[in-house]
Amino acid sequence: MGQGVIGMSGRTLLDKIWERHVVRREPGKPDLLYIDLHLVHEVTSPQAFEGLRMAGRRVRRPDLTIATMDHNVPTTDRSLPLTDEIAARQMAALERNCSEFGVRLFDLYSPFQGIVHVIGPELGLTQPGLTIVCGDSHTATHGAFGALAFGIGTSEVEHVLATQCLWQHKPKVMEIRVNGKLPPGTTAKDLILGIIGQIGTDGATGYVIEYTGEAIRSLSMEGRMTVCNMSIEAGARAGMIAPDETTFAYLKGRPHAPQGELWEAAVADWRTLASDPDAVYDRVVEFDAGQLAPVVSWGTNPGQVVPVTGRIPDPRDFADPAQRKAAEAALAYMDLEPGTPIQDIRIDRVFIGSCTNGRIEDLRAAAAVVKGRKVAPGVRAMVVPGSGQVKAQAEAEGLDQIFREAGFEWREAGCSMCLGMNPDILAPGERCASTSNRNFEGRQGKGGRTHLVSPAMAAAAAIAGHFVDVRELLAEGGAAR
């Protein structure tokens, strides 16, 4: 069980990983955990490295520390000088710090550069049973591999750099059991938005979520990463999925994955990580995937969602006063009226990318909708691959040409429009169909209005100029992934 007694049977995936990594334990205090992989980027690391420098400390395990540039990087012509002074300083600082402290860096011009939560898995750095941290909220992405992965603050980044350990209270464990099969035209993004819509943005506060069930097992690794990525949006500390044959097939042969006899030994060990049949969870939530339709967020948090076939809710229909007030504020910010059909909402911008949906399967799904069609007049649409490797693969498959011919902008890898921290931002009042993970006020730029959707739904909105049920377009040709 989530707070299980050491040595007892019935351990969860979290129990097993946690116990392997406890360096020190004292009654009434947090456990000291060993960290297997520390991922670093340009935004949350400068102060941490400076703290080491001032204290005369070194990075304890530079071999377990990997850095990349993602949050602030330009996604247009990288041969031009950086125009954002803050971004330029942060990237220069990361280069200097990695050089001084011996940390491997995938810089702006590396073929392996990309969003930290995309490159970790694709390089085989992310593996089952590991503890993984990063100074970023969406580190939970790596939990799709059966790892314990969570975001940390800048002071904790410094602590891990210096000691390779971290003090942590053990969270409770919530099982989210996803029954049934995803209907045609629905995706992992629709699934996780539906789950957050059901349990709320604070529904998993204090927990690590373990996702189980038929629908989860049927997902590809990229789909599982999408689900785990947004666990934090339900308030969870992390999201996890037990490793299985799908996990092993994805990892085999990747640059940093074990090879030869080490691979066989690793897989044998990884098979033991799954929660025991008699494991007891602190809370169990069931979700019916079979009833899911493509989902669109209407408000200013990821729990404010409805099916694409639905309408904007009326705040008066919320029994809880806090939810009613939040709905009123969200509708005012989003400039929407209760009762408006989702498919009547017109959009100005489309963003396909991010650590949630910037992988090759996401781009294939969007391209399947876009192929042979054109972006609607007045809509500006862009595709930003999650990494240089994803970009190269997409170009090898001709996906970039499909997007370009339809009128999309094809960009370099980076976080881009997921957050208003780089040149790719919304103007005040612009409305965007986005495959990212947060629709908070101003998240994509001051006054910008964000609707969270799957890559296929974003592509469909770009073509129509408003939200449409992607299943109707797919019926004419192509298939969602």
Swiss-Prot record:
Taxonomy, superkingdom: Bacteria
GO MF annotation, one: 4 iron, 4 sulfur cluster binding
Pathway of action: Amino-acid biosynthesis; L-leucine biosynthesis; L-leucine from 3-methyl-2-oxobutanoate: step 2/4
Cofactor, how bound (note): Binds 1 [4Fe-4S] cluster per subunit.
Residues engaged in binding [4Fe-4S] cluster: C355, C415, C418
Entry keywords, A to Z: 4Fe-4S, Amino-acid biosynthesis, Branched-chain amino acid biosynthesis, Iron, Iron-sulfur, Leucine biosynthesis, Lyase, Metal-binding
Catalytic function, reaction form: (2R,3S)-3-isopropylmalate = (2S)-2-isopropylmalate
PROSITE patterns from the UniProt entry: ACONITASE_1, ACONITASE_2
Keyword Ribonucleoprotein on entry: no
EC number: 4.2.1.33
InterPro entries assigned to the protein according to its UniProt record, in alphabetical order: 3-IsopropMal_deHydase_lsu, Acnase/IPM_dHydase_lsu_aba_1/3, Acoase/IPM_deHydtase_lsu_aba, Aconitase_4Fe-4S_BS, Aconitase_4Fe-4S_dom, IPM_dehydratase_rel_enz, IPMI_cat
One example of a Gene Ontology biological process annotation: L-leucine biosynthetic process
Obligatory cofactor(s): [4Fe-4S] cluster
Self-association and partners: Heterodimer of LeuC and LeuD.
Role according to the record: Catalyzes the isomerization between 2-isopropylmalate and 3-isopropylmalate, via the formation of 2-isopropylmaleate.
Protein family per UniProt: Belongs to the aconitase/IPM isomerase family. LeuC type 1 subfamily.
Name of the protein: 3-isopropylmalate dehydratase large subunit
Organism: Symbiobacterium thermophilum (strain DSM 24528 / JCM 14929 / IAM 14863 / T)
Gene encoding the protein: leuC
